[in-house]
């Protein structure tokens, strides 16, 4: 499946993170797998071919492209992950949601078995020796290397296992079994993170959606009391090894940011409009590298190509600076007009070097 890696070199990514004057703003243009059944495939391939800055490794194949869907993104094919959570989706390529929670009834808790972090990511099996070998191959090729914890690793995972409403009720009432479950999740994640450190990756990415359209999914006080200590333990070996910590959350996380950042986060990946460009700039510009997730709700699906061009420039001027501290990522999903997709690709290419002009 064709998606971009970052347009920038390993050296430029490191310079952006460390405020050491990158040659350009690192850009990532991700094409969700659902797009290959929504758009004319040749039209998408044409756009990729026309924008080599965003897709530096793209090679057009002469055979028909067959989309590959993740286990949790196959319509009509429910998937039970290694935590026992049953996933379903209505559209091929779009990650589904958990429809059956293995501990919806906590009377089952004492019989509940965690997956083995030496053999599983939580979603599927993993061979850590193979992972280390792949990291070594990428390093030998001069590429940026990553260790990616599964998306929704702690609080969301607890919700997937127990159910969102029951999770919040349990935390409010400080139910011992749920608090124990949360601690066990932290230990599971920590075991995986130690493998990333052992493999000597450049960056450890820790993604979990904590925000909604307005405000967080969990109160700041509850996050601070129950989830933050787990985060702190998870980040400690990454900090001690001198690796880059990349933290991701969708949604409005403004009231959680200070607690999220306290663990020594080097890169924060958050959404632009729901948090506000000016707020993001005021909190992070010149201090912490922002991996800015570009709007998918208003401007890119419904704006004009001219508005999109102006918006990408505004993002870079508002949040970035000549020394670095900014990366941009855009995720393409069905529904964005092709002319807007083209405008996005062109603007991301055009303004990547804005601070070097």
Spell out what each predicted region is.
Residues 1-41, 80, 89, 114-357:
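Active-site loop segments of alpha/beta catalytic cores
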Residues 69-120, 140-144:
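A contiguous, low-structure linker/loop signature
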Residues 34-72:
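Segments that shape or occlude catalytic/ligand-binding pockets
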Residues 28, 54, 58, 66, ...:
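Intrinsically disordered, low-complexity segments enriched in proline/serine/threonine
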